[in-house]
From Swiss-Prot:
UniProt-recorded name of the protein: Lysophospholipid transporter LplT
Alphabetized InterPro entries for the sequence: LysoPLipid__transptr_LplT, MFS, MFS_trans_sf
Superkingdom classification of source: Bacteria
Major localisation: membrane
Keyword Membrane (UniProt): yes
Entry annotated with the keyword Repressor: no
HAMAP family hit by this protein: MFS_LplT (MF_01585)
Keywords from the named record: Cell inner membrane, Cell membrane, Lipid transport, Membrane, Transmembrane, Transmembrane helix, Transport
Bilayer topology: Multi-pass membrane protein
Example GO molecular function: lysophospholipid:sodium symporter activity
Compartments (UniProt record): Cell inner membrane
Similarity section: Belongs to the major facilitator superfamily. LplT (TC 2.A.1.42) family.
Amino acid sequence: MPDSQSPNGSLFSRGMMAVIVAQFLSAFGDNALLFATLALLKQQFYPEWSQPVLQMVFVCAYILLAPFVGQVADSFSKGRVMMVANGLKLLGAVVIVFGGNPFVGYTLVGVGAAAYSPAKYGILGEITTGDRLVKANGLMESSTIAAILIGSMAGGMLADWHVGAALGVCALAYAGAVGANLLIPKLGAARPGQSWRFGPMTRSFFTACRTLWHNDETRFSLVGTSMFWGAGVTLRFLLVLWVPVALGITDNATPTYLNAMVAVGIVAGAGAAAKLVTLERVSRCMPAGILIGIAVIFFSLQQAALPAYLLLLLIGFFGGFFVVPLNALLQERGKRSVGAGNAIAVQNLGENTAMLLMLGLYSLAVKLSLPVVGIGVGFGAIFALAIAGLWLWRRKQ
């Protein structure tokens, strides 16, 4: 790796660009691999119920490893942690490519993703500071969403042509991410010398949880980002049922296109937040959170494709504007109190727990045969009220 660099360097320094490129390739691989592996399961006649298990093992890896991955990120150079994590993803993809059990391979990818996340966000606070950190987060989120959009489409399209080729492209993407990690400046460990025994590590993690929860700013950020990502994954599944009911379209492509509009909107919103919101004025993002819920209500009531596409673009814009400043706030304040890696690990625990809870409630609503339009309206209203409540809570602190 190159020598260490000052955290006050340019936003477009070689180190920052290496982080962004590595993140794009890694996220591209994650999303392309999901759809390529789903195609493999169909090709090998796995039962349909097995498909969501892929996402479950991915999320569960984040939750189970949450007490440990933050310390790993803070105990070593974060660039090296990212490289090893992408190496685990590469290994998982290779297992699937060469005919191994796809669930074992995808579990390895999930473990790599869980280890990668605290390092990728924590390193931003080490190679840039202050308001540049908000802009760096904007670049990171834009890169991630672009990779999600392109990777998902590429995975599905390539799998339709040749499943093996699709899986091979995923492995190449991870290999490229490992290569990009080599260009990240070698930084010192943020918090070296911590105990590696199970008891102290778990106590350290839950101490970090308590520390962040008892701080007004980090608690505010944790709750806000967890609500956002929990709602985001729920909206993705809501679209699958909403499209045939509201638009009368029964193909598989339309929900994907609608999801793409959300992704494009998030990229634009993240860019706007980087320019308009600072850490000192982070509450400026809160109206956007409320508007997400209101826009979901209007979207759920649509019966034509064009306004649906436009509203989802708007929902994505509000989402990007809302979540980027909250991420930056947590990284900046968390770095000072518990270390950036531990802060992001705690954030991952909150976000993935919120995903499981919200999806569970959504599944219950579907099982109770509630109308999907009603579910969408209720979901949007509850989200808007929850963000409004969070904003009021923040103002009272």
